[in-house]
UniProtKB/Swiss-Prot annotation:
One of its GO terms (cellular component) is cytosol. This is Glutamate--cysteine ligase. It comes from Leptospira interrogans serogroup Icterohaemorrhagiae serovar Lai (strain 56601). Gene3D superfamilies: 3.30.590.20. The keyword Hydrolase does not apply.
Length: 520
């Protein structure tokens, strides 16, 4: 049975058994971006530390937009606790190689240079893939501003196990089609978008920032605290707001998740169609990869994305068209400043419950009207999530947000009990208890806790960042690695440079690979 044909009765028929036997066998992966900073909280001006390996080819530690913006990646694992432990090992390894530098603990950036062009782009060497990465980042800076690109976050990658899919779809693994699997993941994505505003309230940690990030706020109204701190009183995740990872240009593209064909078609249009304003940027050589709405697929901003691992120089869209959706990438998580590694088990367990609920409830196509309503909900929560008077759209009417959120969170307890019964622990029920406290008291959300502490202690955002970064450095300095980690990381450092050198010896290509299967 294809997921688009799933009825509520069918879902209810299989859900208990699936949850009991197979839901905990999912695969998880984490990616986390973090800025390297000087002891005074200013952005590091040094190149990527040689002891961390090549930022182009290291499997675990790369760089994101900026040269000092570390990007960690863990292996896909069946237990998310193992991902968190691996992320901890990567932080331990990094801290012991950084000498005097710190790892910034927030999504919103540290003290930035006065001139935007002084924010250094990631540098990846002379190979064609390395040069393309830097050119792509130069294009991002022109389109959205380098300051915006210094915002960091956590990505949570999730896929259902094959055994789970076999039970859910009612057929043998060998009989799965890529269309069925893709339809199932799109089913989840649509329902996740219907619930993401709840997660943003519970995990958003960016209501406040240093004024060097936004020297000229324009018409946006922020409160000023002391000399260098700006904040929005009820905000949850400014990272996800119009000053963060959103784009009015991208909003015009009409990219939705009602079918893989529709999604790929609109993405193909975006990566092949020039946008007039961006055309002018291409007057300078190597200013951007191309003048299209999106230079490449990864430029598209969304709280969640369907993914398939590309092979070699294969473009992500070709990978999706050839092999369908393999996993989903949740991109709506701020760095948790109260977790040394930037993410906590309870929030990930709760996110997993949302994903299961998204699968186990019917998921009709999202109309333009509903899409507008969902975006309105998310934007309201981003800016006013901790306002006790906030109302959101629920089934065509307005409801108090905190009441609706508490009710939704409690509705997941049935799943949590079954999962905990299977694992022999209370991980999922404790995750719900953890979130319920935030619904009862907005000051217990990470955004509320952070802002309250900065205001009550009368300190700057940058001071709090330095304080947390120093605490984390001390902790990572004495923590022990998992067995075999140090040798693994040292070997990967050497291997990554060898691969980088091999790439630089190859014949230089002059054009970024095109999407072969698009009709545009």
């Amino acid at each position: 049975m294809k997921t688009k044909e799933l009825t509520q009765s069918k879902i209810e028929e299989v859900s208990l058994e699936i949850l009991l036997r197979h839901a905990v066998k999912a695969k998880h992966g984490l990616e986390k971006e973090s800025m390297r900073v000087n002891p005074d909280g200013t952005l590091s001006g040094t190149t990527h530390p040689i002891h961390l390996g090549s930022s182009l080819t290291n499997h675990y530690i790369k760089t994101d937009f900026a040269e000092p913006q570390l990007e960690y990646a863990t292996h896909p694992r069946p237990k998310v606790e193992a991902n968190i432990r691996e992320l901890q090992d990567l932080h331990i390894f990094t801290i012991r190689k950084l000498e005097n530098e710190l790892i910034w603990p927030f999504s919103m950036p540290p003290v930035l240079p006065e001139e935007e062009n002084e924010i250094p782009l990631g540098q990846y060497g002379t190979s064609h893939s390395g040069r393309w990465k830097t050119i792509y980042r130069h294009g991002l800076g022109l389109r959205y501003g380098r300051r915006m690109q210094t915002i960091s976050g956590v990505h949570y990658n999730f896929s259902f196990s094959k055994v789970f899919l076999r039970q859910f779809l009612g057929k043998e693994i060998s009989n799965f089609t890529k269309e069925e699997i893709s339809s199932l993941y799109l089913h989840v994505i649509r329902n996740f978008l219907r619930r993401v505003h709840f997660l943003t309230y519970l995990t958003g940690s960016s209501p406040v920032f240093d004024f060097t990030f936004l020297p000229n706020p324009g018409s946006l109204k922020f409160e000023k605290h002391k000399n260098f701190t700006l904040y929005s009183t009820y905000a949850t995740s400014l990272r996800m707001s119009e000053i963060g990872y959103t784009s009015k240009v991208q909003d015009t593209l009409g990219i939705h998740y009602n079918s893989l064909e529709e999604y790929v078609d609109r993405m193909c249009y975006a990566v092949h169609t020039p946008y007039p304003k961006y055309v002018s940027f291409s007057e300078n050589k190597d200013a951007q990869l191309n003048p299209n709405y999106l230079q490449i697929e990864n430029e598209f901003y969304s709280p969640i994305r369907p993914k398939q691992v590309p092979k070699g120089d294969e473009r992500p869209l070709d990978a999706l068209l050839q092999r369908g959706i393999e996993y989903i990438e949740i991109r709506s998580l701020d760095i948790d400043p109260y977790s040394p590694v930037g993410v906590c088990r309870s929030n990930l367990a709760f996110t997993q419950l949302i994903l299961l609920d998204s699968l186990l409830k019917v998921s009709p196509s999202i109309s333009e009207e509903e899409n507008f309503s969902l975006k309105e909900n998310l934007n309201s929560v981003i800016w006013e999530g901790r306002n006790p008077e906030l109302k959101i759209n629920v089934n065509g009417s307005k409801r108090n947000f905190q009441e609706a959120g508490a009710e939704y969170s409690e509705s997941l307890r049935h799943y949590a009990k079954i999962l905990d019964l299977h694992t022999g622990r209370r991980t999922y029920q404790e995750a719900i208890d953890f979130q319920i406290k935030k619904w009862k008291n907005p000051d217990k959300t990470p955004s509320g806790k952070l802002l309250s502490e900065i205001l009550k202690r009368n300190i700057e955002f940058r001071e709090k960042g330095i304080e947390l970064a120093q605490e984390n450095k001390r902790m990572f300095s004495y923590l022990e690695y998992s067995p075999g980690t140090l040798m693994k990381m040292e070997k990967e450092t050497i291997r990554s440079f060898q691969e980088k050198e091999e790439l630089e010896k190859q014949e230089i290509q002059t054009q970024y690979p095109t999407v072969k299967l698009c009709n545009h």
